[in-house]
């Protein structure tokens, strides 16, 4: 269903605006929210990253004054230019970037420093230069073997207050053997190199671990990636069919039922996306305008042959 011509909506941080969970809320409280809200248009955002599929349902506004105060900042989906992982949207972008470009055929490394090679306290530039030299060594070894340059995402971490030493998390494609990958790091011999392991959330667990660590130097460049990685795919719609072959209905017409009966969300989503398996969903609200934000996660259904191949694999951990 097309939007009316001239109808422009403002970008705002709906996750910050709607941050109160609906879990265990009494029915009378939910009904009270329905009675005090205004009419609004809801959008549905589909984010595809690898085999992970996220759904975000949120109200849209034409004026920032209509948005809850907590969400009155401009929200950008593509935060590749934002290298500060203290920013929540940058962390989400890195998680999705990893899911889109890597799998259990690839490698996750944690590279550390011995005392002789430890960068000075707070000198993030020195630490980043070390990891950039490492990437150049990797690419030299790959070129010798007729391989293209590495695909990677790296995160640099450090916290002097918590006595956490400099270290780098690197997710890299698995074309080069793990022994060579580890030997190219010259700053320490005590490192971890392991094959990635996906689960129902893809690589989100690992990605969230490396970006959420509380060991960051504020306002410094924290992460980077190789050129040519695929961006997560994002699509925004304002209507869906209740089931295959049905008529399109506005997204807002589904919201009340999802909020009142949260157990209905999996069935609704399975009808919208029959090729996906449901993982989880959460409903949030804000009493500023008595409106809702729904976040759900699904994953592409694997063929039986893919499941057999996955369960037959072995993983090495060092």
Question: What function would you assign to each model-found segment?
Answer:
Residues 1-164, 174-318:
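Right-hand nucleic-acid polymerase module
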């Amino acid at each position: 269903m097309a939007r009316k011509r001239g109808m422009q909506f403002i970008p705002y941080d709906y996750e910050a605006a709607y941050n109160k969970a609906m879990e265990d809320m009494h029915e009378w409280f939910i009904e009270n929210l329905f009675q005090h809200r205004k009419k609004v248009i809801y959008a549905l955002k589909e984010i595809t990253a690898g085999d992970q599929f996220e759904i975000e349902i949120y109200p849209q506004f034409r004026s920032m004054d209509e948005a809850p105060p907590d969400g009155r900042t401009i929200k950008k989906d593509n935060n590749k230019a934002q290298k500060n992982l203290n920013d929540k949207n940058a962390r989400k972008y890195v998680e999705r970037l990893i899911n889109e470009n890597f799998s259990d055929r690839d490698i996750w490394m944690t590279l550390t420093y011995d005392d002789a090679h430890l960068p000075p306290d707070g000198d993030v530039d020195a630490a980043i230069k070390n990891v950039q030299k490492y990437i150049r060594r990797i690419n030299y070894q790959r070129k010798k073997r007729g391989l293209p340059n590495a695909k990677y995402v790296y995160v640099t971490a450090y916290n002097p207050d918590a006595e956490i030493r400099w270290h780098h998390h690197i997710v890299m494609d698995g074309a080069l053997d793990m022994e060579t990958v580890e030997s190219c790091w010259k700053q320490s011999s005590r490192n971890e190199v392991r094959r990635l392991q996906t689960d129902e959330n893809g690589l989100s667990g690992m990605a969230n671990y490396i970006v959420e660590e509380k060991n960051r130097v504020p306002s410094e460049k924290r992460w980077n990636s190789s050129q040519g990685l695929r961006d997560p795919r994002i699509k925004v719609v304002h209507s869906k069919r209740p089931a295959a072959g049905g008529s399109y209905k506005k997204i807002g017409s589904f919201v009340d039922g999802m909020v009142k009966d949260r157990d209905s969300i999996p069935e609704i989503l399975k009808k919208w996306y029959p090729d996906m398996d449901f993982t989880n969903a959460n409903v949030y609200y804000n009493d500023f305008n008595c409106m809702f934000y729904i976040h759900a996660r699904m994953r592409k259904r694997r063929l039986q042959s893919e499941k057999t191949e996955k369960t037959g694999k072995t993983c090495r951990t060092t």
